[in-house]
Amino acid sequence: MMSNSSSEIDVVKTRIPTYDEDDDTILYAYETKPEFVNKEPNIVSDASCNTEEQLKTVNDVLIHCQVIYDAMQNLDKKIDVIRRKVSKIQRFHARSLWTNRKRYGYKKYSYRLAKKLKLQKMKKNEVYESFSYPESYSPTLPVSRRENNSPSNLPRPSFCMEEYQPAEPEEDPILSRTPSPVHPSDFSEHNYQPYYASDGAMYGSSSGPCLGNPRADSIHNTYSTDHASAAPPSVTRSPFENDCYIKEGSITKHPSTWSVEAVVLFLKQTDPVALCPLVDLFRSHEIDGKALLLLTSDVLLKHLGVKLGTAVKLCYYIDRLKQGKCFEN
C-alpha cells in the first residue's frame, strides 16, 4: 500500500495477475517513476532551513580559523628569523667588546673630556721631563735625576770633559823604540804603588803625572782615558741611586718594601717604551712592591686590561726581580 502523502502522479500502478481463477482478489504494484527518484521534495521544513544556515556559519568560522592559523604560522617563522638575527648581533657585540676592551681604570674614573686631556698632557710632560738628562751625554759622568721640577736643584758636574782629553805630545824617537812593560789596566783606581818605565825613571801615583820625563805625560794620559772609559759601570751600576723616592741599595734588596712611586720608577727605567703606558694604571690602583710581586698574567689581562705583549714583558721583569737578576749589568 502506498502512503496517502504520496501522489499518484509520482508512481506507476501495475496490476499483478493471480493464478487462482476462483479468487476475486486484485493486486496492484506501485513503482516510483525514474524522473522522481532523485528529485528533492518541494516542501522543506523550517528546521532544515535553520540547519543549513548553521552549517554555513560554521563553515565561515572554520575558514576564518584556518586563515588565522596560517597567519600565526607565518608569524612564528618571522619570529624565528628575528631571533637568529638578534643572537647573531649579540655574538658580534660580545666579540667586539672582547677584542676592543678599554682599560679597567676607565670604568671607575670617568673624567670630563677637557679634564682628561689636561691630565694626559701633564702626565706626558712628566714622562718627557723624567727622561731628559742634560748632563748624561758624557760617557764619563754619572747619570743624575731631578728631584724637583725647579731648575735650581739640577746637579752640576764636578769636572769637565777637557780633563779627559789627552794632548798628543811629540813622540821621542829614542823612547819610541823602547817598549814599556807596564800597562795602565794592571792598576786599580786606588792603587798608589809606584811603577817603572824602561828607562828606570820612577813615577808617582796614578792620580797625576810626575815631571822630568816627556814619556810620563803620555803614559798618564793613556791611563786616564782607559780608566775613564772603564769607570762608568762602577759609577752608574744602578739607575736608581740618585732618585729621591728610593734609598740607596733598597731597590735591589727589598722590592716588597717599595712604594707606588718606586714601582712607577721601576717601570720607567726598566723598559720605558713598553712599560711607561702602565704608569697611570699602577698609580690609579695604588700598586706597590708587594702587589707588584703578586701580579700574574691572568690578573694583568682580565682585571687590568693590559695587552698581551706588555703583560708578557712585565711578567718576565717581575720574575727576574724575584730572582734578583733584574739589575745585573
Swiss-Prot record:
The UniProt entry lists the main location of this chain as nucleus
Compartmental location? Nucleus
Task: State the superkingdom.
Answer: Eukaryota
Q: Coiled coil located at which positions?
A: none
InterPro entries documented for this protein: SAM (IPR001660), SAM/pointed_sf (IPR013761), SAM_Scm-like (IPR047531)
Q: Which PROSITE patterns match?
A: SAM_DOMAIN
Please report which protein family the annotation says this sequence is part of.
Belongs to the SCM family.
Matching PANTHER family, A to Z? BEN DOMAIN-CONTAINING PROTEIN 2, SAM DOMAIN-CONTAINING PROTEIN
What is the recorded function of this protein according to its Swiss-Prot or TrEMBL entry?
A: Putative Polycomb group (PcG) protein. PcG proteins act by forming multiprotein complexes, which are required to maintain the transcriptionally repressive state of homeotic genes throughout development. May be involved in spermatogenesis during sexual maturation.
Protein name as annotated: Sex comb on midleg-like protein 1
Q: Which organism is it from?
A: Pongo pygmaeus (Bornean orangutan)
